[in-house]
Swiss-Prot record:
Superkingdom of the organism of origin: Bacteria
Gene: groEL
Gene3D superfamilies: GroEL (3.50.7.10), GroEL-like equatorial domain (1.10.560.10), TCP-1-like chaperonin intermediate domain (3.30.260.10)
HAMAP family xrefs: CH60
Name of the protein: Chaperonin GroEL
Quaternary data: Forms a cylinder of 14 subunits composed of two heptameric rings stacked back-to-back. Interacts with the co-chaperonin GroES.
Family stated for the protein in its record: Belongs to the chaperonin (HSP60) family.
MF GO annotations: ATP binding; ATP-dependent protein folding chaperone; isomerase activity; unfolded protein binding
Lineage, broadest ranks: Bacteria, Pseudomonadati, Pseudomonadota, Gammaproteobacteria, Vibrionales
Binding site for ATP: 30-33, 51, 87-91, 415, 481-483, 497
Chief location category: cytoplasm
EC numbers for this chain: 5.6.1.7
A Gene Ontology BP annotation from the UniProt entry: protein refolding
Length: 550
């Protein structure tokens, strides 16, 4: 086992704080409307330019192992804030740095670290309750656009695009961000349910120009198995032919004789039909077939529940207003399912989201909710260069997460004002700890809650102490707009922060800061010594006589 280097007490804490400061100082320059960019070197390709706090934090790795431990712990704050709310990473880092610096000063002065931590925790619990009281619901499109604009670093076009996307696909709709081909941003909305399976044969195509299959008011046959025998499909085909309406077959697969016969019937015009594979795999495929059944008021034909394909009636088939099938995708528009059934299914999937443990499962379940509840919107980010594209895409994704958080828990005044108001409320309530050291912990946390406002003002090139005093003297949403240098009502000026983002930033910062304040020893591997130099080759001197070989 390698030898270890151990540091105790103040020696350990000083090294740790040095690491925290390196990371936090690099991250906090990005905060606010006048935050600066950070350039990240990449091992290949062009450097990345970003104003995203968590992207900067993830790049930092320090040579000194003790400093690096401090930096990595604060990196965890940024990552957790990003995972929980999708934004607020820089705010969380600034808060953590402030709590750690003030807390370690108190520890160096001889205070009990455990009591300091308890005081900090008490202050944070009270501040979170105060933030919830200050929060107002974010319901209208204008407020959503404002949140998106602030999170995208005052880019109003991004805020408006996100608000428009949410309006079209609903609060639960899936909104994805992709790299576009144009110079400007675009919004592409897919109404209805879309899944990533295309036609099984190009001979089904009836819209030659678009290379797609368009079915008007079709029946939909949902089958949870492979279909290779045409006899199994005859009852369904005969029923549909009598009704003179098209048919879409969604099955695990349609192959061989069955597919060939469907193609021939379609080309001869006997029955208008198309076939696609069911989306997903295994249990997820069964669930998605059931989703389509609920959406279209159909029944999944499955031998597991005793339904046979040969005995299908027209009543078992789903229906929709229109279906479009391309080489890659199938879109079902305006299914015939009852709204109450669809909402029941959505509620059931939401419950599964709460119970799910893996992020991948949650994401897939969220997609299913969106497909049932509204639709899918794609924001295509436009830019002149690849470097700008990456930077802008990061900002749009941040803004999207922030707007979702705002819809979920409401909004508070932005620009660091909400934290100052929450701190004032806690101070006014006369919150006290069990002893003086806990009171110091409470004061450390409340003082740290001013740090995001101070950093925003510093980045704008103004005097932070003057602005902080002026904001503290005001009431309600009164704050400082760093972009214009004007004081006023932050919400009226459209400067909003999602409550969830502010709350998460404070909770995660206090959590990690509390752990670091109570650290008394740090252990790391000793640096490896260089391998000993190669032994000299003096014993080979006798080879000098080989000169005659030339």
């Amino acid at each position: 086992m390698a030898a270890k280097d151990v540091k105790f007490g103040n020696d350990a804490r000083i090294k740790m704080l040095e690491g925290v400061n390196v990371l936090a100082d690099a991250v906090k320059v990005t905060l606010g409307p006048k935050g600066r960019n950070v350039v990240l070197d990449k091992s290949f390709g062009a450097p990345t330019i970003t104003k995203d706090g968590v992207s900067v934090a993830r790049e930092i790795e320090l040579e000194d192992k003790f400093q690096n431990m401090g930096a990595q712990m604060v990196k965890e704050v940024a990552s957790q804030a990003n995972d929980a709310a999708g934004d607020g990473t820089t705010t969380a880092t600034v808060l953590a740095q402030s709590i750690i610096a003030e807390g370690l000063k108190a520890v160096a002065a001889g205070m009990n670290p455990m009591d300091l931590k308890r005081g900090i925790d008490k202050a944070v619990i009270a501040a979170v309750a105060a933030l919830k009281e200050l929060s107002v619901p974010c319901e209208d499109t204008k407020a959503i656009a404002q949140v998106g604009t602030i999170s995208a670093n005052a880019d109003a076009t991004v805020g408006n695009l996100i608000a428009e996307a949410m309006e079209k696909v609903g609060r639960d709709g899936v909104i994805t961000v992709e790299e576009g081909q144009a110079l400007h941003d675009e919004l592409d909305v897919v109404e209805g349910m879309q899944f990533d399976r295309g036609y099984l044969s190009p001979y089904f195509i009836n819209n030659q120009e678009a290379g797609s299959i368009d079915l008007e008011s079709p029946f939909i046959l949902l089958v949870d198995k492979k279909v290779s025998n045409i006899r199994e499909l005859l009852p369904a085909l005969e029923g549909v032919a009598k009704a003179s309406r098209p048919l879409l077959i969604i099955a695990e697969d349609v192959e061989g004789e069955a597919l060939a016969t469907l193609v021939v019937n379609n080309m001869r015009g006997i029955v208008k039909v198309a076939a696609v594979k069911a989306p997903g795999f295994g249990d997820r495929r069964k669930s998605m077939l059931q989703d389509i059944a609920v959406l279209t008021a159909g029944t999944v034909i499955s031998e597991e529940i005793g339904l046979e394909l040969e005995k299908v009636q027209l009543e078992d088939l789903g229906q929709a207003k229109r279906i479009t099938i391309t080489k890659e995708n199938t879109t079902i528009i305006d299914g015939a399912g009852e709204e109450t059934m669809i909402q029941g299914r959505v509620a059931q999937i939401r419950q599964q989201i709460e119970d799910a443990t893996s992020d991948y499962d949650k994401e897939k379940l969220q997609e299913r909710v969106a497909k049932l509840a509204g639709g899918v919107a794609v924001i295509k980010v436009g830019a002149a260069t690849e470097v700008e594209m990456k930077e802008k895409k990061d900002r749009v994704q941040d803004a999207l997460h922030a707007t979702r958080a705002a819809v979920e828990e409401g909004v508070v005044a932005g620009g660091g004002v909400a934290l100052i108001r929450a701190a004032s409320k806690v101070a006014a309530s006369g919150l006290e700890g069990d002893n003086e050291e806990q009171n110091v912990g409470i004061r450390v946390a409340l003082r740290a809650m001013e740090s995001p406002l101070r950093q925003i003002v510093k980045n704008a090139g103004d005097e932070d102490s003057v602005v902080a005093n002026n904001v503290r003297a005001g009431e309600g949403n009164y704050g400082y707009n760093a972009a214009t240098g004007v004081y006023g009502d932050m919400i009226a000026m459209g400067i909003l922060d999602p409550t969830k983002v502010t709350r998460s930033a404070l909770q995660f910062a206090a959590s990690v800061a509390g752990l670091m304040i109570t650290t008394e020893a740090m252990i790391t591997d000793m640096p490896a010594k260089d391998a000993s130099a190669m032994p000299d080759m003096g014993g080979m001197g006798g080879m000098g006589g080989m000169g005659g070989m030339m």
